A protein has these predicted regions:
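C-terminal binding/interaction regions
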Residues: 150
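Beta-strand-loop-alpha-helix segment that lines the small-molecule cofactor/substrate pocket
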Residues: 153
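Feature captures the catalytic cores and cofactor-binding loops of soluble hydro-lyases/lyases
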Residues: 1-146, 160-215
Length: 215
């Protein structure tokens, strides 16, 4: 799974016509660009900075889950900090995705768990409840159901619908193969230029075809 990036998975879903290509909002960013995330969605529906249902989901969670928190983009409170993140990491969760703000940025980034959020706010979370766990939610613009595959890296987060994982992976692998061929073509062009040999056509076939279609 790690050989396929969220970008390649998005391209795979684009070829299959999946809504938004599974791409969460561009302002949902990782706290640490060096961490790769992959796991099964455990969803949380909450609002107004209330982290009670997030606590419940963490302590009921299992290794391999990615906590997907539909926080409605709330910015007046943090939904969590490094204590909750530390508990999630200790339990073995594979990642945390929050459509809202967090705090304790440095502490969260140092944990052995990928965390994605829309920003930072020092104000403490609310504790109201009840919220909902493992229902279909919309998080950062993408519909997420329990059991969906959630993948993230420095580019952002991608969600693959549970029932379409195999076909998306196949489409993404096809895209990955194409990219390898393009990298080889680019490397070959560079070598030809450096060695003074005849330069091949570097443009992808689709570019040439579109140009010819417009002529």
């Amino acid at each position: 799974m790690k050989k396929l990036s969220p970008a390649q998975l998005c391209d795979g879903m684009a070829s299959l016509g999946i809504e938004r290509n599974g791409c969460m909002d561009a302002d949902l960013l990782p706290l640490d660009d060096g961490k790769f995330m992959v796991g099964t969605a455990c969803t949380v529906d909450t609002e107004d900075g209330d982290n009670f249902p997030i606590h419940v989901a963490i302590y009921q969670g299992k290794p391999g889950y990615v906590l997907v928190v539909a926080g409605k983009g709330y910015t007046e409170r943090a939904y969590m900090g490094d204590l909750m993140g530390g508990a999630a990491a200790a339990i073995g969760l594979s990642g945390i995705v929050i459509d809202g703000y967090v705090r304790d940025k440095v502490g969260l980034a140092a944990l052995d768990i990928p965390v994605y959020a829309k920003g930072f706010m020092q104000r403490s979370p609310a504790k109201k409840g009840p919220g909902e766990i493992n229902t279909v939610v919309t998080c950062a613009g993408v519909k997420v159901a329990p059991g969906d595959l959630v993948v993230g890296d420095y580019d952002g987060v991608t969600v693959i619908p549970r029932g379409r994982i195999e076909e998306v992976l196949a489409a993404a692998e096809k895209k990955g193969d194409y990219e390898l061929k393009r990298r080889d073509a680019i490397d070959n062009y560079r070598k030809c230029r450096e060695e003074g040999r005849e330069l091949p056509n570097l443009a992808p076939a689709w570019v040439t075809e579109m140009l010819q279609g417009k002529s």
